Amino acid sequence: MLITVLKSKIHNARVTVCNVDYEGSLSLDEELIKQANLRPYEKVLVANVTNGERFETYIIPAPANSREVGLNGAAARSAVVGDRVIVMAFAMKEPDEEVDTTVLIMDEENNIKEVKKLKA
């Protein structure tokens, strides 16, 4: 039996761009993608802390060190610039298998304030 566990989380990032007319979904600073142990085009769950909405989408890389957290296409209807969001990715594993979970805690300017390494 496989179970689904949290693999990566970016907590309290600020939305910097909303572009309904852009092809793509969640544009995320390439450096944040690496630090959070995510991959371009990986499926993610996004929770908008500001309005309570949740939606699934995928990651597209934004320029490294831009601190961009952009919602594009239909996802842009789910937030406004300045909203706080949580980005989560999951992995499937055997119950006795260990998964390294990475959690990035962000500050107001989308700089990494803290990195947590957990075992799932």
UniProtKB/Swiss-Prot annotation:
> Which Pfam families does this UniProt record tie to the protein?
Asp_decarbox (PF02261)
EC number annotated for this UniProt entry: 4.1.1.11
Quote the pathway field.
Cofactor biosynthesis; (R)-pantothenate biosynthesis; beta-alanine from L-aspartate: step 1/1
What protein name does the entry list?
Aspartate 1-decarboxylase
Domain of life from the UniProt record: Bacteria
UniProt entry tagged with the keyword 4Fe-4S: no
What is the organism of origin for this protein? Coprothermobacter proteolyticus (strain ATCC 35245 / DSM 5265 / OCM 4 / BT)
Question: Tell me, what is an example of a GO biological process annotation in this record?
Answer: pantothenate biosynthetic process
Q: Could you tell me which SUPFAM superfamilies the record lists for this protein?
A: ADC-like
What is catalysed by this protein? L-aspartate + H(+) = beta-alanine + CO2
Keyword Transcription appears in the UniProt entry: no
